[in-house]
């Protein structure tokens, strides 16, 4: 069975990058630089959402279903820098050649990882294989790779369920809850910068982990819908997630399970 890797990232404004591009003096604080960037962006677009190349990755969380095991974790440690996080993510793809699954990964997560990985000089040979690589199965990647929108090595659930129409897309939180799963708890993407400024990187990683579990559970329901899991197999897979989380002691999993009806 091909391993499945579900992933999600959390980002903050790349203050250092914006400072360098706009020649902001060193004496201006990071918080002030961020406010300048937000103001500039609002004037341009009406939103303070930063362009993807100026989104600095502070957390990458994953669910890996491989063999008999299921695990959820955040890549690296609290002390790891952006380059280390991104390299570790691509190293996981190098190791497992998994099917990767995301929610809006094609529209946000992967382009951010492309830009930021390029800036930091990371290596991602397996990920970028389009059929001309040196791997034994590289020829297969000409027809099914991680990059092409309509291939299956990367399943962007949001994009696929919306039939590749941005106006038809649904929010993960709402869809997860409608499917009977907990959805978001206590934080969303708009709160990440404030939490980061308050030194709450651990809480950001916890939030990212719950989001990636929501994505995985919705993916299981999708696999049942498309006939890849029969009802019994679907029930077993959902039970594996619940049982694994029940055995974990962290507070965010206790909160998550409390919001998940039996």
Q: Which stretches of residues belong to each language-model region?
A:
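Metal-dependent phosphoesterase core characteristic of DEDDh/y 3'-5' exonuclease domains
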Residues: 2-3, 55-58, 62-79, 91-206, ...
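Conserved RNase H-like, two-metal-ion catalytic cores of nucleic-acid enzymes
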Residues: 1-92
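Acidic catalytic cores of enzymes that act on phosphate-bearing nucleotides/polynucleotides
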Residues: 241-262
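Charged, low-complexity, helix-prone segments enriched in Lys/Glu/Asp/Gln
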Residues: 22, 31-46, 208, 222, ...
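Generic detection of intrinsically disordered/low-complexity segments and helix-coil linkers/edges
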Residues: 12, 43, 201, 247-250, ...
